[in-house]
Swiss-Prot record:
Plays a role in chromatin remodeling and regulation of transcription. Acts as a chromatin reader that recognizes and binds acylated histones: binds histones that are acetylated and/or butyrylated. This is Bromodomain-containing protein 9. InterPro entries: Bromodomain, Bromodomain-like_sf, Bromodomain_contain_prot, Bromodomain_CS, DUF3512. Residues 148-252 form the Bromo domain.
Length: 596
């Protein structure tokens, strides 16, 4: 305890004896007088001192000095009491609060020294408010944001980065990897990544979405798992960091505000007793002791399993985080290359309605973007007041019968297959399909025409497999139509040679064949000789008729006997014709017709 403050007597009571009356009336004549010595003035003039005493002290200046002195003493008492109470309060404050209060006191002391003594209390309060207002930071204008102000995306990514760095207490991924730390690292890893590079990209606002940040984080962990072996610490930490990071940055954790701010506790160091200590404790170590030591060492140095095994409870969350990351990457890629497209799939409800679900919809929309699919959505709306559509038959492209002998198709087929009838051509088209199929079948048969029966049978089997058995049916039907046509014609004696095994005399057929061949040969020679003789005659008649111009077109000379001889039907024997007309009957003059 300090020294107790001594109380001061504020005043002394005195009176003048000459002015007082009786002792009973003296109480009203007490006068308050200060207990002070009179002022002494010492003047030095030329080395001599002159002392002068002041008067009785009843001047007006004395009372003014007295009031100022009492006011100052009163202030000092208040300050002392305030300091004492503040010291008692400071006992229960922490260091930061004490430091802050000391700075405030120092600042106030400096301000009071700068202020003049004649300022009023009101002015001082206003002055204090103004000074305190200047200590506050100047607010930036809202219309012109500061250049270094971070965007909400940057703040979110910085928060993610801080949380991820807490998961790496040893700082393995804090800075870029060099060849001195990991020899041959850049020969294996082509795209290195670390936390410092990610922080620079955040500060430069290079990340346009959280998906790009997650892609760089996954690249960093994949690089560590690619370069290091599974039993190393770096591989295990990278796999664990990948799992926890994706779980933290998942959409559900971001929406629910799942903040994992707890720092990982360092694993306690396990100190195994050395073999020497064991021997000291037991001079004769048994086999059980060695077995226990081996089991303990194997449990310590045994490599950890996968961070996300099939039996792990966090496996589903890890897979969900990876799936969400892949979905976000696919959505960003679609929006980047096809910004206005809507990709989805069709789904049928229980009531039978068909719904189209959009995959790359708005990610902020929690509900699925679905559309009902019906005929009105697939086709345009019909105009009102039109219930039926008009129909007009087009007669310009009317289909006619294709099997008639006068059509263009039958004429074309006759030019391609001159030795076949229209019915046979139809059978071939029905069996082989088109012209290409018919030509292919004929080409194969022509190729094995001079071969044996085995090759022909192989070709027929091949055509049957190609046409599905239509080849054999076509040949059978064509052979049947030929047999029907031959039954109506003259008997073919040469076909009877196949019945030689029957008890019939076939010697006469060979002689008939020889006679028929000789007759056909002689007839062909005679026809050629006659035609060669008639050609010069036709040439002479043509010259006679075309050499001289007739006098008038109305009169034409009569036909001569030579003309009738050359134009007779017996001379025109080029093929078999049923109706042959005399060409000269159309060239008679009109005079002869009038005479008749």
């Amino acid at each position: 305890m300090g020294k107790k403050h001594k109380k001061h007597k504020s005043e002394w009571r005195s009176y003048d004896a000459g002015e007082l009356g009786s002792p009973g009336d003296q109480s009203q004549y007490y006068v308050d007088k200060p207990l002070e010595k009179p002022l002494k003035l010492v003047l030095k003039v030329g080395g001599s001192e002159v002392t002068e005493l002041s008067g009785s002290g009843h001047d007006s200046s004395f009372y003014e000095d007295r009031s100022d002195h009492e006011r100052e003493r009163h202030k000092e008492k208040k300050k002392k009491k305030k300091k004492k109470s503040e010291k008692e309060k400071d006992k229960y404050l922490d260091e930061d609060e004490r430091r802050r209060r000391k700075e405030e006191k120092k600042r106030k002391r400096e301000k009071e020294q700068c202020d003049s003594e004649g300022e009023t209390e009101v002015f001082e309060s206003v002055r204090k408010v103004d000074i305190e207002a200047t200590d506050r930071p100047v607010r930036a204008c809202r219309t012109h944001p500061a250049e270094n102000e971070s965007t909400p995306l940057q703040q979110l990514l910085e928060y993610f980065l801080r949380q991820l760095q807490r998961k790496d207490p040893n700082g393995f991924f804090a800075f870029p990897v060099t060849d001195q730390i990991a020899p041959g690292y850049f020969m294996i890893i082509k795209n290195p990544m670390d936390f410092s590079t990610m922080k620079e990209k955040i500060s430069q606002n290079e990340y346009k979405s959280v998906t790009e940040f997650k892609a760089d984080f996954k690249l960093m962990c994949d690089n560590a798992m690619t370069y290091n072996r599974p039993e190393t610490v770096y591989y295990k930490l990278a796999k664990k960091l990948l799992h926890t990071g994706f779980k933290m940055m998942s959409k559900q954790a971001a929406l629910l505000g799942d903040e994992d701010t707890t720092t990982e506790e360092p694993t306690p160091e396990i100190i195994m007793p050395t073999a020497a200590e064991v021997v000291k404790k037991s001079k004769k170590p048994s086999k059980d002791m060695f077995r226990v030591m081996e089991e303990d060492q194997s449990s310590i140095f045994e490599p950890e399993g996968n961070a996300c095994s099939l039996t792990d409870s966090t496996a589903e969350e890890h897979v969900l985080a990876l799936v969400e990351h892949a979905a976000d990457e696919a959505r960003d890629k679609i929006n980047r290359y096809l910004p206005n497209c809507r990709i989805g799939y069709l789904k049928k409800n229980a009531d039978g309605t068909l719904i189209y679900t959009v995959v790359n919809g708005d990610p902020e929309n929690e509900e699925e973007d679905t559309h009902l699919v019906d005929l009105s959505s697939l086709s345009s709306k019909l105009l009102p007041s039109f219930t039926t559509l008009g129909f007009k038959e087009d007669r310009r492209h009317k289909v006619t019968f294709l099997n008639s002998t006068g059509t263009a198709l039958s004429l074309q087929n006759n030019t391609l297959f001159t030795n076949l009838k229209p019915d046979q051509i139809d059978l071939m088209y029905a069996g082989y399909g088109d012209d290409t199929g018919i030509q292919c079948a004929l080409s194969l048969q022509e190729f094995v025409k001079d071969c044996g029966s085995f090759a022909k049978r192989m070709v027929n089997d091949l055509l049957d497999q190609i046409t599905g058995g239509d080849h054999s049916r076509t040949i059978y039907q064509m052979a049947g139509s030929e047999r029907e046509g031959s039954s109506n014609s003259v008997l073919d004696y040469m076909a009877l040679k196949t019945y030689s095994d029957v008890s019939l005399d076939m010697s006469m057929l060979s002689s008939l064949d020889k006679v028929k061949k000789e007759l056909e040969h002689e007839d062909s020679h005679l026809n050629l000789d006659d035609a060669s003789k008639l050609l010069p005659d036709f040439h002479d008649v043509h010259n006679d008729r075309g050499g001289s111009r007739p006098s008038s077109s109305s009169s034409v000379s009569n036909n001569s006997e030579r003309d009738h001889h050359l134009g007779s039907p017996s001379r025109i024997s080029v093929g078999e014709q049923q109706d042959i007309h005399d060409p000269y009957e159309f060239l008679q003059s009109p005079e002869t017709e009038n005479q008749n």
